[in-house]
Amino acid sequence: GIPCGESCVFIPCTVTALLGCSCKDKVCYKN
């Protein structure tokens, strides 16, 4: 539920995905 500061509208989460973030509502979130 914490915004990771990366969007995933056109491309999936990249850098933040390595930190455990996933795409939700066009934004990368963690928990």
Swiss-Prot record:
Its main location: secreted. Pfam families: Cyclotide (PF03784). There is a cross-link at residues 1-31 (Cyclopeptide (Gly-Asn)). InterPro entries: Cyclotide, Cyclotide_bracelet_CS, Cyclotide_sf. It is found in: Secreted. One of its GO terms (biological process) is defense response. GO terms for cellular component: extracellular region. This is a cyclic peptide. Keywords: Disulfide bond, Knottin, Oxidation, Plant defense, Secreted. Disulfide bonds join 4-21, 8-23, 13-28. Probably participates in a plant defense mechanism. The presence of a 'disulfide through disulfide knot' structurally defines this protein as a knottin. Belongs to the cyclotide family. Bracelet subfamily. This is Cyclotide cter-R. It comes from Clitoria ternatea (Butterfly pea). The lineage of its organism: Eukaryota, Viridiplantae, Streptophyta, Embryophyta, Tracheophyta.
